[in-house]
């Protein structure tokens, strides 16, 4: 299994298709997020799906149960591998979403705590736990309810794996080739994330902003076994 999910963070449909075509044999999946979905909607997802690369649709759904269930109903018709929704939307929201995808290819992945957030950010929201404790709590809830996996940083991946078992998928964003500063707070290198127990690592700019995205993806994959 190729653990790389390449984030196609663009509003340009042609650019997304070009990346997807060039990377389909180099990565495990491509990620389409809110930026792309706001610009192109379901039809844009269908166009990228024609490139024959699995799609991780990262919409982070978070609304009342009925609204999320109806949204999942619409999305399940798309050819996507995984769809994200916030675990903090609650048990009822998650269970109703799961009921929609029973027997379908699409897997529901729960978002724990955004990697852009740290302990101070959670405290401002009235969350008394530190980020790691909050992630573990939410991951255990997701597992109990029946979600297929979670999104969490590499800093929590090892404990999530211990608590939730080997078949529970762990997707890790906040992947950086070095420890530079940007909009992410809880980060790790690709190898650190995999060694911590992640099944998939989400990598965007180090691949898409390189002069040769396919070659960059190959080098990252090779670095995981060096």
UniProtKB/Swiss-Prot annotation:
Catalytic machinery residues: 60 (proton donor)
GO CC, any one term? cytosol
Q: Pathway, per Swiss-Prot/TrEMBL?
A: Pyrimidine metabolism; UMP biosynthesis via de novo pathway; UMP from orotate: step 2/2
Which terms under GO biological process does the entry name? Answer: 'de novo' pyrimidine nucleobase biosynthetic process; 'de novo' UMP biosynthetic process
Tell me where the transmembrane regions lie: none
Q: Which UniProt keywords apply?
A: Decarboxylase, Lyase, Pyrimidine biosynthesis
Lyase among keywords: yes
What are its E.C. numbers? 4.1.1.23
Task: Supply the InterPro entries for this chain.
Answer: Aldolase_TIM, OMPdecase, OMPdecase_AS, OMPdecase_bac, OMPdeCOase_dom, RibuloseP-bd_barrel
Question: What is this enzyme's catalytic activity, as reactions?
Answer: orotidine 5'-phosphate + H(+) = UMP + CO2
Citing just one GO molecular function, the answer is:
orotidine-5'-phosphate decarboxylase activity
| Residues at which substrate binds | 9, 31, 58-67, 115, 176, 184, 204-205
**Matching HAMAP family:** OMPdecase_type1_B
**Stated role:** Catalyzes the decarboxylation of orotidine 5'-monophosphate (OMP) to uridine 5'-monophosphate (UMP).
User: Which family, according to the similarity comment?
Assistant: Belongs to the OMP decarboxylase family. Type 1 subfamily.
Assembly and interaction partners? Homodimer.
Record protein name field: Orotidine 5'-phosphate decarboxylase
